[in-house]
Each structure stands twice: as C-alpha cells, then as structure tokens.
C-alpha cells in the first residue's frame, strides 16, 4: 500500500482555512510557522517602507513651503502734506511704507512711527492715545475719527489715506485751526448756572440717580470736532450755525437738573434760527462720532423743547 502525503491548503486571508493570502498580502501555509513569520516580516517591512516614503514627501512639502515667500506686512500710507513754510508748493499726498509687524495696531501708532523713523517734519496732534482728549481727530479713508481709536486696515494690497478734518483751515499737515469751533462751544456757556445762591462755595447740588442718568450720552463728548467737520449744514453756515458738538453740549446743560437756566438756554439758541434750526437732520454727525454719541437726537430734542415752550 502506497501512502500519499497531501500538501497543506493555503490559509484564507479571512479565516485561515482555504485558498488566499494571509495578512492580506502574502500566502501562508497552514502548519508552517516559519512561513507565517516570514510573511509577517515582509508585511512589516513594506509598512515601514511606505511610512518612510510618506515622511520624505512631507519633508519635501515643508521645504517647498519654506522656500515660498511669507506674506508681506508692509503697507502704504498716503498722508496729506502742506506747510506754510513752503506756501508755493501745493498740498499733496505723500506715501510712506510701514511694516505693520513692527508697529502698534492703531493709525496713531503708524503716524508716530512715521514721525519717529521716516519723516520728523510730519505734523499732527496727539495726547492721551486712549480716545479721551480728542486731539488726534482726522479723516482716515474718508471717515472722520480719532486716530488712536481707528485700527489699521491690515490689507496690504490697498493704501490707507490720511487727511485733515474737512472744511477746516489747515495750519500744517494734519493740524487744523479749531479757533472758531471752540468759540462756538464757549458761546453755549458750558458750565453750571444757578439762580439760587448757595451758602458756601463747597455746597453740593444733589441729583437723584434718574436725574443723573439723563446726562448719559451727552457728557461723554470729547470735542474732537469730527461731527461738526462731517456736517454739510456746518460747511455751508459755519459762522451762524453752532454745529453738532456745541449743540450737544448745550443740551447736556439743558438736561442737567442742577442747572436753573434751561429755558433761557433754549431761547438763546432759538433766536435768529441760525444757531439751532440750520440743522437739517442729515445725521452725518451721529454716523461719524467716534464715541458713538447721537448729536442729531440732542438737536432734535432741543427743537422740540423750543416748540413746546417747556424745557
């Protein structure tokens, strides 16, 4: 009797019984541990080779990214220039290129960097740098605002244009003459006026919380002149019309419960109509106010008080 030895079947990739490939790649003979070990070693080497190739591709991608230039942070600023020392030279816009990566976030920071590092002759007002004093008011990209509260537009593909407040006489560069503006502010008598005399100068004039709340949105004005410089009615009648800023302060004292001249204040503003009624409710003042106040509403309220005859 002749005994015939049969060959073992190929292990299945799924269950190890039947034809196929073990580990999904290489054939394995059931009952031969060495063959299975060799298949596992080959699969591990192939996986290691694939990982190495992916690492090389990542390295090449990183080199390509490093070779490409970084986005530029240099931005152009076009600043209005005019000097009384050279009256024959026409006003013009001068370009300065500033690296935003080495500068503060506000337009005032840019102007100070230009003055310190690029051109010491540039003239502009500034003081508090916190939106309190109103000194650095100017027109930035067509909008009247204070430079210390205006963030820099980080889009380096377009230039930022900085000019003086419109409809103001220019003293030099970004500095305008505010003499008439302050005279109009003074004309509304922006101080407490009393008919009842107090016993001593140190006597306090008490207010209820409700009376004090009526002053919110009025006393915060910083006299930056952005609203008046944006008002077409003020452009056309600068000598007669007091402008939004002065009228806002006038209403602040009309609304103050401690003041005893409210009726006289309203009547003085309404005389001749030009001081108060030249306002056409265009509301450019409200739109441009950097402190988010509403001078147009204050002017409208004073017109109503005058018409009703009861401030």
Swiss-Prot record:
Location(s) in or outside the cell: Mitochondrion inner membrane
Residue ranges constituting the 2Fe-2S ferredoxin-type domain according to the UniProt record: 77-168
Catalysed reaction equations from the record: a quinone + succinate = fumarate + a quinol
GO cellular component, one term: mitochondrial inner membrane
Pfam families assigned to the protein according to its UniProt record, in alphabetical order: Fer2_3, Fer4_8
Annotated transmembrane regions: none
Transit peptide: 1-63
Recorded metabolic or biological pathway in which this protein acts: Carbohydrate metabolism; tricarboxylic acid cycle; fumarate from succinate (eukaryal route): step 1/1
Keyword match Transit peptide: yes
Topology term for the membrane: Peripheral membrane protein
Stretches assigned to the 4Fe-4S ferredoxin-type domain: 211-241
Keyword flag Chaperone: no
One GO term (biological process): respiratory electron transport chain
Cofactor: binding comment: Binds 1 [2Fe-2S] cluster.
EC number: 1.3.5.1
Binding site for [4Fe-4S] cluster: 221, 224, 227, 289
Keywords: 2Fe-2S, 3Fe-4S, 4Fe-4S, Electron transport, Iron, Iron-sulfur, Membrane, Metal-binding, Mitochondrion, Mitochondrion inner membrane, Oxidoreductase, Transit peptide, Transport, Tricarboxylic acid cycle
Compositionally skewed regions (Basic and acidic residues) per UniProt: 51-63
Region (Disordered) residue spans: 1-70
Cofactor(s) this protein cannot do without: [2Fe-2S] cluster; [3Fe-4S] cluster; [4Fe-4S] cluster
Domain of life of the organism encoding this protein: Eukaryota
Matches recorded under PANTHER family: SUCCINATE DEHYDROGENASE [UBIQUINONE] IRON-SULFUR SUBUNIT 3, MITOCHONDRIAL, SUCCINATE DEHYDROGENASE IRON-SULFUR PROTEIN
Assembly description: Component of complex II composed of eight subunits in plants: four classical SDH subunits SDH1, SDH2, SDH3 and SDH4 (a flavoprotein (FP), an iron-sulfur protein (IP), and a cytochrome b composed of a large and a small subunit.), as well as four subunits unknown in mitochondria from bacteria and heterotrophic eukaryotes.
Function: Iron-sulfur protein (IP) subunit of succinate dehydrogenase (SDH) that is involved in complex II of the mitochondrial electron transport chain and is responsible for transferring electrons from succinate to ubiquinone (coenzyme Q).
Family listed: Belongs to the succinate dehydrogenase/fumarate reductase iron-sulfur protein family.
Full protein name: Succinate dehydrogenase [ubiquinone] iron-sulfur subunit 2, mitochondrial
Record organism: Oryza sativa subsp. japonica (Rice)
